[in-house]
Every structure is written in C-alpha cells, then in structure tokens.
C-alpha cells in the first residue's frame, strides 16, 4: 500500500527553510525558540446593519466561509444600545480564527493574490502594530479574493484581519511579516 504524503503549504515551507534562518541572523537570537512565528490569523467581519435586517448576517457568513475555508462563528451583541436599535444577543458580526495549515494557506493567498488585486493599492501601513508584534489591518471589500464571485455579491463588506505572532516587539513582527511577503509602505 502506498502512503500519500501530506502536501505542506508553500509559505510554511518557505518560513521553515529560509525565513527562520534570515530572522535568526538579523536579530542574533541565542535560542531557536526566540525566532518569531505566526500563531494565528483572525478574520472578523462586522455587520452592524444586521441589527435591522437579520438576513444580512447570512451573506457575511457565506463570504467568510468561502474566503477562509472554515465555518465562521457568529458574534452576538453583549449589551443593548438604544441609539443603534440594538438588543442584547442580536447577531452583529462573524469571525474566523485560522491556525495551522489553513492559516499558512490563507496568508499565502492574501499576500500573493488578494492584496495585489486591490485597486490603487500602495502598500500596507507599517504603523498598525500593537506593541507586541501583532498586526491588524482592514480591507474595504471582499471582491479582491478570487473565491468570491463578483456577480453574486449582494453588497460590499469590509473585514479586519489580525495576524498574531510570537514576536516580542513591533520591529521583530514587522521583519517577520516583511519576510513573509507583506507589502509595507516605505515612509
């Protein structure tokens, strides 16, 4: 019987074979475990209008499932806010946490396919790190992902993408993401 070997994600292989060594040289780490890596990627889609029309959340859930390849978790309002006509427990967003191979595949698709397809894209802001090497950025619509059929979009939806790393500061996090292929703006 032949054993089928599991195909490793392209970006994961590149990280293990090239990027780890480059980061170790750049920051002179004493221990291999100090080299920063990616822990998880959280993709969040807030659908505030779902407070008025509950059907809107379904479109967001379908889009996120197509983009990430994983069923999203529906986020509910934690407290009522009268001005927004919002009741506690109403669905107002959807999020997906990607880890492991799915995370590497998503990052690869994001960097090599989705970001270059954005109109008038000048690069990601290098200032959106949180102080601990984690990076968060927003996308204004979902059409740049090739999994989404542009003709079937009911409305453009933005999303927040957070890349959580084991880096201890912004400099290490920025170096890691730059090596992974994130296109940062030059100041």
UniProtKB/Swiss-Prot annotation:
GO cellular component, one term: ribonucleoprotein complex
One GO BP annotation of this record: translation
NCBIfam families in the cross-refs: PRK00010.1
The name this protein goes by in its record: Large ribosomal subunit protein uL5
GO function terms (MF aspect): rRNA binding; structural constituent of ribosome; tRNA binding
UniProt keyword list: Ribonucleoprotein, Ribosomal protein, RNA-binding, rRNA-binding, tRNA-binding
Domain of life of the source: Bacteria
Family per record: Belongs to the universal ribosomal protein uL5 family.
């Amino acid at each position: 019987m032949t054993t089928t070997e599991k195909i490793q994600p392209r970006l994961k292989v590149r990280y293990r074979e090239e990027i780890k060594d480059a980061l170790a040289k750049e920051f002179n780490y004493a221990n291999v475990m100090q080299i920063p890596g990616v822990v998880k990627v959280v993709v969040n889609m807030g659908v505030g209008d779902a407070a008025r029309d509950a059907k809107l959340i379904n479109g967001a859930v379908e889009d996120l499932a197509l983009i990430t390849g994983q069923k999203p978790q529906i986020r509910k309002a934690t407290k009522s806010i009268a001005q927004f006509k919002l009741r506690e427990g109403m669905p107002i967003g959807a999020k997906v946490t990607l880890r492991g191979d799915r995370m590497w595949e998503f990052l690869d698709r994001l960097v090599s396919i989705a970001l270059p397809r954005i109109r008038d894209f000048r690069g990601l802001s290098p200032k959106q790190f949180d102080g601990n090497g984690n990076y968060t950025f927003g996308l204004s619509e979902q059409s740049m992902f090739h999994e989404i059929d542009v003709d079937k979009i009911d409305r453009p939806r933005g999303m927040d993408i957070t890349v959580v790393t084991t880096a201890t500061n912004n400099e290490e996090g920025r170096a890691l993401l730059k090596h992974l292929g994130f296109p940062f703006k030059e100041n």
